[in-house]
Amino acid sequence: MDMKQALNRIASNLDLSRDEMKDVMRIVMNGEATDAQIGAFLMGLRLKSETIDEITGATEVMRELATGVTVNAEPLVDIVGTGGDGANLFNVSSAASFVVAAAGGYVAKHGNRGVSSKSGSADLIEKAGINLNMKPEEVARCVEQIGVGFMFAPAHHGAMKHAIGPRRELGCRTIFNILGPMTNPAGVTRQLIGVFTRELCRPMAEVLQRLGAEHIMVVCSKDGLDEISLATVTHVAELKDGEITEYDLTPEDLGIKSQSLVGLSVDGADESLALIKAAFGRSHDETTEKARDMIALNAGAAIYVAGLARTAKEGVDMALDAMGSGLAAGKMSELADFSQCF
């Protein structure tokens, strides 16, 4: 299928098959489509709503064209969000990555700079003194030896450059906003994924089910966070043993008291890093305790997804231990030191 055929199909409110979507995505990612065609394609998909087949095909092509990272370590997991929730919270998923590593997991963290937020995961990682410009084999060594490594998305998805202009000019969410979390360059099959709307929870779980994922939790909280929230109910679509189940979680279900998010918003990577370091330390003021609990909720779920705990609640206990013992702070320092060797 060529670009004009695809645009005519979408303009008629007709869906593309998985293979047709792969054809069109290759045209886009190989630089063979004009900016006008890419913009029309992205907006047309959004207006008619992307199907499971279309998202699956697009994900396959992004994975196919990515610069991969081969990691020889298990259990390998990622904690990632779509972004776009507008809450400007500190970098919960990045903080949780160090906690999971401290609990015995291996985290291949995939992320980018902030677009809608004031501190994206890459901004935080860089501020922590961690080298963003590593080769794939160097990232793999970080994961294997430290337990955590960071893959800077633009370095692994070079073909995305062809869509940057049209995406920026459109200025709204498109299919690319939901593809990032599903295109981890290390090929992880265990993930905690946060999304900006509950409507994406099950579709993303279904896409990853088709693509062979082992254990996935896709989450969105009632207050709109792409995280498990400390303040309210979080909706979950969980893929485990080949089956998808949907349910709601409260902080109390995981052994944590519900609390407001006041004090957890930040104005940039500096503030985010300071709050994470406090949470990893021995401070017991109210805001630090909230941050620690928020990290524990998400790290605990990831520890469970990694297979290191029988339940997410057990994972939360392990996460709190990893922070209280100083091991999580140690992982952050170790990665900063080790990554600067390259």
Curated annotation (Swiss-Prot):
It catalyses: N-(5-phospho-beta-D-ribosyl)anthranilate + diphosphate = 5-phospho-alpha-D-ribose 1-diphosphate + anthranilate. The keyword DNA-binding does not apply. Binds 2 magnesium ions per monomer. Its cofactor is Mg(2+). Mg(2+) 1 binds at S93, E227. SUPFAM superfamilies: Nucleoside phosphorylase/phosphoribosyltransferase catalytic domain, Nucleoside phosphorylase/phosphoribosyltransferase N-terminal domain. Pfam families: Glycos_trans_3N (PF02885), Glycos_transf_3 (PF00591). HAMAP family: TrpD. Homodimer. This is Anthranilate phosphoribosyltransferase. The gene is trpD.
